[in-house]
Amino acid sequence: MLHENSPSFTVQGETSRCDQIIQKGDHALIGISPFNSRFSKDYVVDLIQWSSHYFRQVDILLPCEREASRLLVASGIDNVKAIKKTHREIRRHLRNLDYVISTATLKSKQIRVIQFSDFSLNHDYQSLKTQVENAFNESESFKKSCLDMSFQAIKGRLKGTGQYFGQIDLQLVYKALPYIFAEIPFYLNTPRLLGVKYSTLLYHRPWSIGKGLFNGSYPIQVADKQSYGIVTQL
């Protein structure tokens, strides 16, 4: 059910350039993480409602089973069980999203739900993903940042289920990497992938790897018309 009182968020750009792009209000891509308790139905409804007022065009980014299940496998769940569990979780999000974006107040916005698998044959996406993988193999600083991001994702999952005991095997950290590699192209250049002029990827916290992607610390960089915004619900 849509909320009658307009939900309110603040959005803070990763850089001053991000803030300038956000102020244009052109396009927002809302990132949703399966298995993250932050993304309750109410929170997602509120964020979509707010974004649809703030930005002219809004789309949703949701992982597909193959990549998202990697996080569960890296958390110690059997591969078959992980895929089944991920399938159920993503179906739940898709049902909720289908309901929200089909309501009268949002239908005219033509909000799309984007999944990684939609881009399996997309040349631009595959090119960006290859650049990410090459940077991982060629740059020690980028490799370290990717591994740390993977570690933090697994740690968050284990903490959420009461299973974190202070150490995570490096092999498990590597298992979750494809999820990160699949997501980074949307951090780098959503305008190129979705055919919009400017775009802001919205999420509720900074990416640990983000600062380096914006300031030129790595072999790959964020495109000029791409921004990243940290949203906080008031």
Swiss-Prot record:
This is Cyclo(L-leucyl-L-leucyl) synthase. NCBIfam families: tRNA_cyclodipep. Transmembrane segments: none annotated. InterPro entries: CDPS, CDPS_sf. It is an enzyme of class 2 (transferase). The active site is at S33. GO terms for molecular function: aminoacyltransferase activity. Its EC number is 2.3.2.22. It comes from the Bacteria. It uses activated amino acids in the form of aminoacyl-tRNAs (aa-tRNAs) as substrates to catalyze the ATP-independent formation of cyclodipeptides which are intermediates in diketopiperazine (DKP) biosynthetic pathways. Catalyzes the formation of cyclo(L-Leu-L-Leu) (cLL) from L-leucyl-tRNA(Leu). Can incorporate various nonpolar residues, such as L-phenylalanine, L-leucine and L-methionine, into cyclodipeptides. Substrate binds at N36, Y179, I180, F181, A182, E183, Y203, S208, I209. The record marks N36, E183 as: Could have a critical role in the catalytic mechanism. The record marks K85, R95, Y179 as: Could be involved in aa-tRNA binding.
